[in-house]
Amino acid sequence: MTENETIFWNRILELAQSQLKQTTYEFFVLDARLVKVENQVATIYLDPMKELFWEQNLKDVILTAGFEVFNAHISVNYQFEDDLASEIEESTSNHIFSRQTINSLPAITSDLNPKYSFDNFIQGDENRWAVAASLAVANTPGTTYNPLFIWGGPGLGKTHLLNAIGNAVLLDNPKARVKYITAENFINEFVIHIRLDTMDELKEKFRNLDLLLIDDIQSLAKKTLLGTQEEFFNTFNALHNNNKQIVLTSDRTPDHLNDLEQRLVTRFKWGLTVNITPPDFETRVAILTNKIQEYNFTFPQDTIEYLAGQFDSNVRDLEGALKDISLVANFKEIDKITVDIAAEAIRARKQDTPKMTIIPIEEIQTQVGKFYGVTVKEIKATKRTQNIVLARQVAMFLAREMTDNSLPKIGKEFGGRDHSTVLHAYNKIKNMIIEDESLRIEIETIKNKIK
């Protein structure tokens, strides 16, 4: 493309993204491309099923970009994959689509994100079962857990696991027919095929897969469009009856998909349902340690731990924080990211993030001391009698659980102890309460007093 053509196309993409939902933009716009602009006509390569959407929703975008870049009224000529050399006659009404062109669409595209793999997925206690189940499905699709239903809040790695499964299956069998799609985009495709009267093609596309990966299936429950759930039900049955693997993700359990037909809910529970919860501190540190390799900055350990303490709800917040820091560091030409710099960079993000109630570590020490009959001074000191050691370790555990302080900061509040001592105490108590119900009850009692 010429320089002006590049500017023109980038402006179209920019305007389209600002006006459309992200999922709609990704589905209808991202795979289109500009072939040329000649004689005030823009030739755009497009999936034929998406032409109607462009004509109805993006005409003004193209006109605006045309006047901005070429100072001219730019009309559009859509070309399809097997027809790039010929022009398609435009019509604003009674639009006719070439069935021959639609039937000549290429083999299924997976739409997987190649950057997501099992190797770069950070495991922790909160996602261990989901990872194990995903690996089992990737190794023996259609036999172990079918369907696999992964649920959890946003930004916890569900999409990563879906793509990791698909990429692993294709690595093992490049000829496998794999499809990743959001429920929202499944609905979009359904609507398009209904309009074009090409439902047989939709059925052929989805019912002949080896692996179907559906993200955010709860979106299907929100739609009342007649026939959408019916079509997915039939697709599910066709795949399952042929021992083809289905993996679904959701922000809630199958039983809480209230607007979904009961027969679908029942089928979602045929296989295995696994949950992903927010990452614990160690996992957040591991995620950050992995992510910072993408940046050309030095992150001291105390900065990493500080950031891990600031965002405890999902991975996206951590990734967003690193982008904020990168922006500030590049602007200030800083190579080493200190805690102060990190705090400055994420200030705005923290204002939009649910904040943990500020609890002084001294308050935790006081309540733990009262419960176990020891003083705060003894908790901070080095005396190692059994009851004092237990109180000290419980207080460190609660300081980690109930505050966003870094390990070094907590250690400083406990007589200047090293961060490794705090981590040891935290892990010890965390493991003990799994086996010791009485200790778990004691800690819950103390937590209630602190709150």
Swiss-Prot record:
GO terms for biological process: DNA replication initiation; regulation of DNA replication. Keywords: ATP-binding, Cytoplasm, DNA replication, DNA-binding, Lipid-binding, Nucleotide-binding. GO terms for cellular component: cytoplasm; plasma membrane. PROSITE patterns: DNAA. ATP binds at G155, G157, K158, T159. It is found in: Cytoplasm. Residues 1-101 are annotated as: Domain I, interacts with DnaA modulators. Transmembrane segments: none annotated. Pfam families: Bac_DnaA, Bac_DnaA_C. Residues 101-110 are annotated as: Domain II. It comes from the Bacteria. GO terms for molecular function: ATP binding; ATP hydrolysis activity; DNA replication origin binding; lipid binding. Residues 111-329 are annotated as: Domain III, AAA+ region. Residues 330-451 are annotated as: Domain IV, binds dsDNA. Oligomerizes as a right-handed, spiral filament on DNA at oriC. Domain I is involved in oligomerization and binding regulators, domain II is flexibile and of varying length in different bacteria, domain III forms the AAA+ region, while domain IV binds dsDNA. Belongs to the DnaA family. Plays an essential role in the initiation and regulation of chromosomal replication. ATP-DnaA binds to the origin of replication (oriC) to initiate formation of the DNA replication initiation complex once per cell cycle. Binds the DnaA box (a 9 base pair repeat at the origin) and separates the double-stranded (ds)DNA. Forms a right-handed helical filament on oriC DNA; dsDNA binds to the exterior of the filament while single-stranded (ss)DNA is stabiized in the filament's interior. This is Chromosomal replication initiator protein DnaA.
